[in-house]
Amino acid sequence: MAAGVDEKDKKTIVFLHPDLGIGGAERLVVDAAVGLQNRGHKVVIFTSHCDPRHCFDEARDGTLDVRVRGNSIIPPSLLGRFSILCAILRQLHLILQITLLTSELRTLSPSAFFVDQLSAGLPLLKLLVPTSPIFFYCHFPDLLLVQGRQTWYKRLYRLPFDTWEEWSMGFADSIAVNSSFTKGIVSHTWPSLASKRSLEVVHPCIDVRSTSDSSQNPNDDDKDVLPWTKTGIILSINRFERKKDIALAIKAFASLSPEQRGKAKLIIAGGYDNRVHENVSYHMDLVDLAEGAPYHLKTATAKTVVSALNTSPDVEVLFLLSVPNTLKEILLRSAKLLVYTPSNEHFGIVPLEAMLRGVPVLAANNGGPTETVVEGETGWLRDPNDVGEWAKVMDKVLNGMGEEELKRMGKKGVERVKGRFADTQMAERLEEIIERMPKGDAAQSGMILLVVGAAVAAVAGVISAVYWKLW
């Protein structure tokens, strides 16, 4: 256990997260929970969904106390619709289940709550447990992530949720965001909230200890494991979602001449869930893009380590769906370049994972990566609309840089991550913020009840009207 707090200062911190799957938000939650636990605090994570086959190792191997609640009445969606409404109702169900329907939360006697991604339940949580302060981590305003606002009834349907998001966030005792970029977006989106609250910046982090022995020589341990290491691996790790713009990596790689590519391989790995239609359809679109005109690249898709290792040597683009941590680790250690394609990414944890393992990063010159990747030192920042510039960097890494030059760049990446984004630093920062939060007053419950009741009635009226229109 890492050096932590004195016995008298140990707290019980309860996390609330909607769906503990595999993604950047979930990685942050797991890292925050493990970090606080390593400092001596008791940590319990409540979530409405956690599939042992599709979650991070710490959530399934006993490292963390993960409890699934609030999932027995409301489904994640209704015929593919109303996902935000269902998510809110599932969160409210979870809160009611652990507070009123059982004594589970009372038994834990939480010192503080860590809530992220969904703020809708904060008023109810504050009402039922007014003495425990709430820390809310805003990854990005949800209202800016929603697609398909073209129709008037969809805009009307979203209006109460968008309003509720800002209003409910005001019930948090402290609010943090994941980057200065996100802080600017939040301040612009909700100027009233930003004027009343000081938004903390708490960068996501990674565990720097598990790679400390081998980060300086990232390829040495894995040359005999992956058959493609010597030919050059360009790696992309992202969820199979269109907003991640994975197509950019394929277009840039395909822009290289056969001589420039040589026997190099573009490996596209990432989160993939058969339940999510976009994951399935986007993977198919990417395969069609790579194989079709004008690129005509040879592709293969693998879902297991064995099938990945058995792919034909002449495969140019390899898709790996929902890679386990062990294979992801090997890929990161074996890659020559990590390409991170999303534009205006809120933060982006994958570039840190690559830099920690001595791998240079090519990322978009906007959003979170501008706070992590140092141009020309730990990687490159390029315009995501200029495929040619991305191709030039790929060519430079594959053909224009020697091993020593790549190692020097990799070493600077390791130093930057360990100096700025270590997991111990995030845990200490969270601990400091939680310690500063004032304890609530049970006498506030009556006023909160009146406010919450009026708000619920108003929202229910709007949703009901739109519900009948949509159906």
From Swiss-Prot:
Domain of life per record? Eukaryota
User: Pfam families of this UniProt entry?
Assistant: Glyco_transf_4, Glycos_transf_1
The GO cellular component terms are:
endomembrane system; endoplasmic reticulum membrane
Q: Where in the cell is it found?
A: Endoplasmic reticulum membrane
Residues spanning the membrane: 446-466
User: Per the record's keyword annotation, is Aminoacyl-tRNA synthetase included, yes or no?
Assistant: no
Sugar attachment sites are: N178, N279
Q: Name one GO biological process term.
A: dolichol-linked oligosaccharide biosynthetic process
Q: Does the keyword Cell division apply?
A: no
Q: In which pathway does it act?
A: Protein modification; protein glycosylation
UniProt cross-references to InterPro entries, sorted A to Z: ALG2 (IPR027054), Glyco_trans_1 (IPR001296), Glyco_trans_4-like_N (IPR028098)
Reactions the enzyme catalyzes:
a beta-D-Man-(1->4)-beta-D-GlcNAc-(1->4)-alpha-D-GlcNAc-diphospho-di-trans,poly-cis-dolichol + GDP-alpha-D-mannose = an alpha-D-Man-(1->3)-beta-D-Man-(1->4)-beta-D-GlcNAc-(1->4)-alpha-D-GlcNAc-diphospho-di-trans,poly-cis-dolichol + GDP + H(+); an alpha-D-Man-(1->3)-beta-D-Man-(1->4)-beta-D-GlcNAc-(1->4)-alpha-D-GlcNAc-diphospho-di-trans,poly-cis-dolichol + GDP-alpha-D-mannose = an alpha-D-Man-(1->3)-[alpha-D-Man-(1->6)]-beta-D-Man-(1->4)-beta-D-GlcNAc-(1->4)-alpha-D-GlcNAc-diphospho-di-trans,poly-cis-dolichol + GDP + H(+)
Which keywords annotate this record? Endoplasmic reticulum, Glycoprotein, Glycosyltransferase, Membrane, Transferase, Transmembrane, Transmembrane helix
How would you describe this protein's topology in the membrane? Single-pass membrane protein
**Protein name per the record:** Alpha-1,3/1,6-mannosyltransferase alg-2
Gene name, per UniProt, is alg-2
